Structure formats: C-alpha cells, structure tokens
Amino acid sequence: MQTPTKKFVTLVKRFAAVVAGTMLATHALAGQLHVFTSNAAGFNTHSVWYDDGKEVTVVDSQFVPAIAQALVDDIQKKTKSPITRIIVTHPNPDKFNALSVFHKLGAQSIASVATAAAIPGVDAYKRYFWINLAKAFTDESYPKVESVQNTYTGTQTIRLKSGETLSLFELKAPGVSSNQTVVRIDKTGDLIVGDLVHSNNHAWLEGGIVNGKATPNMAGWKAGLKELPALAKGHPKAKVYGGRGRFLPVKQAVEQQTAYLTKAEAVVDSYLAVLGDKKSELADPAKQAVHHAAIQAELAKAFPSYAMPDLIGYSVYGLVQQKLAPASK
C-alpha cells in the first residue's frame, strides 16, 4: 500500500481536528492498514499492521526475531505511533515465534485461549523438525517462544486510542490450523486471517499440530471460510488479508480458496488411488519425498499462475497421512 506524503498526512490531521472540534469526533477518519512481507527465508509471510494515528496494532509476528525486527524497523520508518499490541491469528510458528521482539517494545500479545494453549505443542513439534531433521537451526539459534500475555474466547472488541475499534472473532471451525482468529478492521470491514487464505498462492496443507501430529481438517477449513462473508457484512469493498499471496474482496477470496482446497484434496485422492500397493512408500522417509514432489507437480499444473508451489511439497505430508490413516487401521 502506498504511503501518503507528510504534507498529505498533515492536511488530513488538520481536517480531522476540525471535524473532531465541530462534530464531537463522531466521524473520525479510519486509520491506515499496511502490509509487511518477509523475504523467502521467512516464507514470504505477510504481517498486517494497522496505524490509527495514535498506536500500531500488528497481526502475526513472523518466523524469526530478525525478520520481526525488520518489520518493526519498517513500521518505525513509516509512523511515529508506538506499537502497542501484537495479535496471533492461529498457532503456526510464523505467527508466534517472534513475540519476544514485540514484548521488548512493551507491546501486549493477544490470542484466543485455544491458540495460546496450542502454542507449546506446536513449538515442540516444529523445534524438533528444524533442529533435528532439517538441521537448519541449533537449540540455541531456534527462536525461544514467549507466552501470549492476553487471551480471549469467542469475540473481543479492542478500542484503539483514536476511538476506532478492532474486533477479534474466534471461528467456530478450526480453519487452516487447530484454531483460528479473524481480526476485523471495523471501519472498513477488512478481515485479517493469517494462512486461512492464500489468494493466488498455494496453501500450507499440513494442518494443525494436535497431540504431536499433523492433523489437517479440510472440511473444517472450508467451514471457517464460510464464516468470513458474515463478518464483513455491510462493507462491500472489504478485502481478505491472508498470510501470503494477494488481497481479494471477501466473496472472491472465499470462493477461490474453497475451490483450491477441493482441488487439492481431489489431487491427493487421485494420486493415492493410482499408487495402489506402493502407498507404503509414503510412510518411508527415504521414498516419500518423490511422491510429495509428484503431488506438488499435479497441483501446480492445476493452478499454473499461483505462487510458491514449494509450499505443497513441504506441507502435503499432513494431508497424505490423514488420507492413509483409515486404511492403516
């Protein structure tokens, strides 16, 4: 999003002051929504931040502290408003791993009770993967996750210093992970949803980490998507701000993501059917990567314009193992 010039901001502030003085601030101007996107090392992850002119609210922390610090630096270059809170949309590492950076600034962290409760288990699972399997980190270099400071259940309204409000909604369905918060900018109806939506971008198909196991819930993901239009009711121009990809109007974003998930599941089902007796190879660490790559190729072929096809290869194991589970019982 293009940043206004200082001259324009000054004019807007003067206008807002006049309005506040003559109309008792009943028509306060909306703040500004910004998006920071990490580099490839951070998986091209979006963090959305909202500046109401008096304070900044950040949604999702990024994967490692160095990238979170780059986010903070970007914010501080663009506004003098202090960062006062960081909201976690769901329990995935790129949403909570770098909370420490924001806590050091005095910002308060917020997540649903369910998301906060899930974080330790997800952290243990991912820490083991990145240190012991991927060997991309050591125990010392992998982010030390700090606890969420404030929790809520169901819904919560946050009144900003400007008088504007943000609404938090805990979806009834699990969504992309085991629990999902949607942050609504109440002035505009824009919805910030983390990886629940990746418009024009491939999805993360691992599922939530539950009891130490990847547990995708495609029906629950689609059900979560169906909840979004009602949250933006009365705001026909509202967009969905997902964890990666582009930002589309709510109806379009929901339809596109739902169609993608349906196709992804169909591709996996078809591949497993053709694989036949070789399905056991999907449980063999030495052989499964070839199959994951083949599924990635099929899904990438179905969506040739979508970015980040590698996300499929990294994450589809969760969906594959879920599909295989009934046959193994």
Language-model regions, residue ranges each:
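Active-site neighborhood of phospho(di)ester-bond hydrolases with catalytic His/Asp-centered motifs
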Residues: 59-61, 84-92, 110-113, 191-195, ...
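Active-site-proximal loop/helix segments of hydrolase catalytic cores
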Residues: 165-232, 248, 256-259
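C-terminal regulatory/interaction regions
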Residues: 274-329
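Active-site metal-binding motif and surrounding structural segment of the metallo-beta-lactamase
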Residues: 55, 66-111, 235-236
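Gram-negative bacterial Sec-dependent N-terminal signal peptides
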Residues: 1-29
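Metallo-beta-lactamase
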Residues: 116-172, 177-179, 187, 223-233
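Conserved beta-strand hairpin/beta-sheet module of binuclear metal-dependent hydrolase folds
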Residues: 31-77, 181-195
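Divalent-metal (often Zn2+) His-rich catalytic cores of metallo-beta-lactamase-fold enzymes
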Residues: 190, 219-283
